[in-house]
Amino acid sequence: MSNTWDDVWASDSDVETERSPDLVKLRENHSKRGYLDGIVSSKEEKLQEGFNDGFPTGAKLGKQVGIIMGILLGLRTRFGDEDEDLSKAYIDAQKELRINKVLSKSIFDPNFDLQEKHPLITKWTDIANTYCEKYHVPSIQ
């Protein structure tokens, strides 16, 4: 004779518990959450690695752009009223040396390394140096 109080926690009906809709849904949610956490964690690690690898290159290019723009602005401030070409060159440099153009994917190899000298930096360094020579100002090294 079976006593109804023998198994108050209903542990003998494991099969029914495993098929409970609430538990199935809970298991699915935990599984999805674990999957998403794994994806997010992986992306964060790769993003950080990419940032760590690319930051020195971006910082170097940014510094070079800053030097070019600083020299052109200084020359334009001093000589721009009498030199229309210099004023135009400064405006063109502002357009061409925007961050999205300097760091364009097309300039880098698949590993995001520069193959050679950066074409925009080289172009504008030469232009700035031409104006430096014209106005007897130390050029960009």
Curated annotation (Swiss-Prot):
UniProt-annotated location(s): Cytoplasm; Nucleus
Entry keyword set: Cytoplasm, Nucleus
Superkingdom, natural source: Eukaryota
InterPro entries: Essential_protein_Yae1_N, Yae1-like
GO BP term (any one): protein maturation
Ranges where the record places region deca-GX3 motif: 34-74
Main subcellular location of this protein, as a coarse class: cytoplasm
A GO term from the CC aspect: Yae1-Lto1 complex
Miscellaneous comment as given in the Swiss-Prot or TrEMBL entry: Present with 1500 molecules/cell in log phase SD medium.
Quaternary structure (record): Forms a complex with LTO1; the complex bridges the interaction between the CIA complex and RLI1. Interacts with RLI1.
Family to which the UniProt record says this protein belongs: Belongs to the YAE1 family.
Name of the protein in question: Protein YAE1
Source species taxonomy: Eukaryota, Fungi, Dikarya, Ascomycota, Saccharomycotina
